[in-house]
Structures are given as structure tokens and as C-alpha cells.
Amino acid sequence: MSNSVTNFEMSSVLPGKKPCQGKNNESQVVQTTPIKKHSVTFKNQSSLGVIDHYARLTNKSHSSVIAEVVDLAIPILEKCNRHNWSINEIKNDLLKFSIKESINRSRGKTEVTLEEYCSLIWKTNIMSPLKIPIADYFQLNANDEFMGKDEKTVIRERLSSLRENYDMEKAIYIYNQRHFDVKHQSVSGYSNIILIHRTTFEGYYFDAGQALLLSTSQLIIFGINEVLRRKGIVMPYPVVCWIDIYHVNEMVVMLPVLRKTDVSNRVNVPDDIIINPYSQESRT
């Protein structure tokens, strides 16, 4: 099998109208068929050979043969479209079963805590497997305690571009290290970017926009609810559980999970989130 690539252009007919002159030089409007071209790439040389052979037998052009093949495949594609919802439901059911079985095997028990369940959902169905480490250098309006406006703008533009390129819902930028050079008035550091390709699964909503950076030791000593109470943090909706999604600088990024029915109560935040554990502002 050859790996060569061959390109063809196909034309599709679209309805339209254009003016023309009648027999008495009167202006008329007639129906036309504007042409829309599509480029087709063949990576499989054997497929191209079959099309070429069929074109010679039927005395047709390559584009006509390809168009004929596409027309034959349309009913199949239409049927796939009709059943696409059912296919996705089956995939979700299989994923739910896989998640529960994975937890049961790891714990050796049938009981599964909601935190365990949601944590595994996060790892398998919410967070993208793409890992994007970044080394940054900003010679911008920034300082040691607070991130400058230009620094935030550059990061958000990068996150927005990544979300668009990879078709993601949200993106989280987390500094692993951040150093401020007083002499050169510059910031350098290392970070990771977490991409989120969906925010809901099985009736749960994973609210990355309300993720909190909390002390690891305080969470161990007091637990999440007491830490929130001591900090005076009140969530705008009932949280069913909290899951840890990242550990950095002796701190933990905790993400709230709520029921999908309570999503209307959440606070709207940007899709691009920046978390900086090395300044007085933990997130922006």
C-alpha cells in the first residue's frame, strides 16, 4: 500500500439566480447553479487506482466518479447522523461502567465515595489528556506580588488560541515556578496548562471557574468545609463534593462539583483561568 497523497477538486451545485437578457433584450432573472469546489485528498493509492479504473470503464471524469461514490454514501451518513445520539449515549454508559469498575478493582470494595467517582470522571472524561508544559519569560508590566496586566493578557491570548485549536471548553494556566527579576523588571517561570474538553458528565458539572488554591496542610488538618469557613468563602450554589486537580508549592487546586440542575446559580467567569501560587493574588 502506497503512502502517496493525491489531490482532486470536486464541484457541488448550489441554487442561485442571476440576471440575463431575454429575446427582446428585456432583463430577466433565471435560475443558475453556482459551483462550489471541494478538495479531496487520497492517501491510499489503491483507492485512487480503483477510481481511475472505474472512470476509464464508464468514460467519466475522476470528479464525476468521486461525486457518484459520495452520493451513494450519503444515505449511510444520514443514518449515522440519526443514530449519533444513541451512539454517544452507549459510549457514556460504557464509560460510567468502566469508571465504577476501575474504582471497585482499585479499592476491592463495592462502595464508592462521590469524591472518588467524580475524581475519576475528571481524569477520564473532563480533563484533556494533553499535557502542555510552558517556559515563560515576560519583560512586561509585572512585579513580584501581583501579575501585571500585560502578563495576564499574553497568557489569556495563549489559552484562547489553545482552546480554539484543540476545540476545548476551558483552559487553566498554573504557575509551577515564578521568579521576578528586580534589575530587569522581568518575570520568568514554568507552568502547566490544563485543557478541559467538557464540563458536564452524568448530571454533574465540574466548575473550573470556581477552582480554589488552598493550603495542603490546612486541608489535612481541618478538611475542606472548615477551611472554607475560616476563609469566609461561601459558594453560590450547593457543592456535592470537592476534588483535587493539581498540587503545587504546598498548595492544592480544589475544584467544586455541583449538580447540573444547579448550574444556573453559578457565577459566570472567563473560560481562560490563571492560577498563580506565588503572589498575593492566587488566581485571576
Swiss-Prot record:
**Protein name as it appears in the record:** Uncharacterized protein YagM
Region span, Disordered: 1-28
Which species is this record about? Escherichia coli (strain K12)
InterPro entries under this entry? UCP007319 (IPR016513)
Polar residues compositional bias: what residue ranges?
1-10
